[in-house]
Amino acid sequence: MIGAKTMIRSLGGRLFTMCAVSMSVAVVTISLSLSAPDFGAADALMLRLMSTYNVSGAALALIKDGGIVLEKGYGYRDRETDAPVTTATLFNIGSISKSFTALGIAQLVDQHQVDLDTPVIRYIPELRLSDPRATQAVTLRQLLSHTSGLPPDEQWPRQVPPTREGIVRGFVTMPITAQPGARFQYCSRCVVLAAYALEQIVGQSWEAYTRTHIFVPLGMATASFGLLGLEQAPDRAQPYRHDAVSGEVPIPWSRLQYLQALAPAGGIDASVSEIADYALLQLDDGMLAGHRVVSAQMMAELHRPQIAVGADWTAAARIQNLHYALGWFTADVRGVHLVYHNGANPGFRAAIVLAPSASAGVVVLTNGESDRFTEGAARSLLEQLLR
């Protein structure tokens, strides 16, 4: 998976000047909670940024006052067939998947099946880390907040084992580079380890648990996992990379094979409509349409800052109080507290930015590789919603 630093660098920027650009647009769902000029401004921004950053297709959801006010598809999910993006088109959401794993663990806390601060070896007795002291000390909280002391993503082998068990066996080969609980080090495989613990506790795969206890209650009927889920979906986005000479080049599906084992950290596939409902769950203290998915107490814990993120992650001067929570980043931008995450895998980018105090949020998904597109759109559209 690709690093998450660029999202943080973008959050402090100013609103883009908006202008219209001609491109295919597929409108599926629009509420009238916002005025027509606001929708026009959103369209203009999306289309301009898609043109600027060579994006084939994108999907957008806007949330205001606790309700979805706009869901829309732009451009093409497949350039070869000119198939348009709709609000039902599946995109890989990358590291936003980490918050789903954290939510699953939170549900088990509600059911008294697990404790965030109990050493994870209690749930995975065969676990071995390179330092025996860390083996006995690392907790689920530390795995979900990237504070386990295990090294950051860039220090792990590029080759991902094909199974979750293989990933877990590989932990013993990695050095402990910080005292558990002391330092933020963004570690995707640590979230996979938390998901593996969940599997041992509930006696089923992380995928089966997530579908039953998160997807089904949220009505995420088409959401899936990894490469297999995307390949089998009729309304899926083809991933692209931009080449200065050849234009938009399809990325072979084989490049996403690693997502199956790493699904708890970056392999969920979903539509913008489904992620919009997931955003509503976050903004309504664990409730959606009158159904409680997780307790309000645990939803607050998921969003509570756990560890300050280092200065090397903060390039935008307007960002304050940058922290990682449990599956989420948090920050204060111009006096507004944000809960957010981005996602990045080959041919896909995603962003979800929430302002809980205003019950507002933005979801942007794309089948291109421009972080500037997803993050710029999310930031600027949230500014509009908060005016």
Q: Where in the sequence are the language-model features?
A:
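N-terminal Sec-pathway targeting helices
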Residues: 9-19
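The feature captures the short pre-catalytic strand/loop hairpin that immediately precedes
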Residues: 165-177, 245-260
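Catalytic nucleophile serine of serine hydrolases
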Residues: 95-96, 185-188
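Short, conserved catalytic-motif segment at the N-terminal edge
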Residues: 38-91, 113-115, 122, 130, ...
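Bacterial N-terminal signal peptides
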Residues: 17-31
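Active/ligand-binding-proximal structured segments within catalytic/core domains
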Residues: 101
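Catalytic loop of the DD-peptidase/beta-lactamase superfamily, centered on the K-T-G motif
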Residues: 3, 9, 34-72, 155-158, ...
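Active-site helix/loop module of the DD-peptidase/beta-lactamase fold
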Residues: 43, 57, 87, 92-96, ...
